[in-house]
């Protein structure tokens, strides 16, 4: 199932470094989410967590976006 996220942005956790992780932020279903995307693909969510039913598809979509932006 494809999910629709908007205003996706990322930046390295540490200046001038691609690893070990990135700060991510985006909107999903009108809610703003933030977190840390780790090299392993794990997402460490910020203050808000997505619904348990939405999390697998949302994680997959973020992983695809990160592959496109970071590992091109």
UniProtKB/Swiss-Prot annotation:
Pfam families: DUF5342. InterPro entries: UCP037692. This is Uncharacterized protein YheE. It comes from Bacillus subtilis (strain 168). The lineage of its organism: Bacteria, Bacillati, Bacillota, Bacilli, Bacillales.
């Amino acid at each position: 199932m494809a999910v629709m996220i908007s205003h996706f942005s990322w930046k390295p956790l540490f200046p001038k470094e691609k690893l070990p992780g990135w700060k991510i932020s985006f909107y999903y279903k009108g809610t703003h989410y933030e977190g840390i995307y780790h090299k392993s693909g794990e997402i460490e969510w910020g203050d808000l967590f997505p619904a348990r039913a939405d999390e697998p598809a949302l994680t997959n979509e973020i992983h695809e976006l990160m592959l496109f932006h970071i590992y091109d």
